[in-house]
A protein has these predicted regions:
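Charged docking surfaces used in two-component/phosphorelay signaling
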Residues: 15-23, 113
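Short hydrophobic/Thr-rich beta-strand motif most characteristic of the beta2 strand and flanking loop
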Residues: 25-32, 40, 102
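Active-site beta3 strand of CheY-like receiver
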Residues: 44-50
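Receiver (REC) domain active-site loop signature in two-component systems and cognate sites
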Residues: 55
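C-terminal output helix
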Residues: 106-115
């Protein structure tokens, strides 16, 4: 079973993302800030990470950069899911190492398609 790590400081967003993934075969892991997300990614080695950008303790951009420096996590697909859709933010996301960048609110169908695409399904 493939694992998906959801990283967002909003309990509501985490709940909505978990509900969207409920009908999928993925095991879902959650973290409520970037620092915890990095720790869980290193420990759990998920197959994919959905990462918010603006979070306490560590931004999604910084978390992404750190994950790209770690041998165990440097190739894990990371999809940034954020309200920050300005071109400068999108560019920073890709420079930090994300593999895809989508803006909230995101349609459940679109989210699932992005996951399947990144997981090669």
């Amino acid at each position: 079973m493939k694992k998906v790590l959801l990283v967002d400081d909003s309990a509501t967003i985490l709940m909505m993302q978990k509900m969207a993934l409920k009908t999928t075969p993925y095991q879902v892991i959650t973290a409520n800030n970037g620092e915890d997300g990095v720790k869980k990614a290193i420990a759990e080695k998920p197959d994919l990470i959905l990462m918010d950008v603006i979070m306490p303790k560590m931004t999604g951009f910084e978390a992404c950069r750190r994950l790209r420096q770690e041998e165990a996590t440097k190739t894990i697909p990371i999809i940034m899911v954020t309200t920050r859709g300005e071109p400068i933010n999108v560019e920073e996301g890709f420079q930090s190492g994300c593999t895809d960048y989508v803006t909230k609110p995101i349609d459940t169908f679109e989210l699932l398609n992005k996951l399947r695409d990144q997981l090669g399904e």
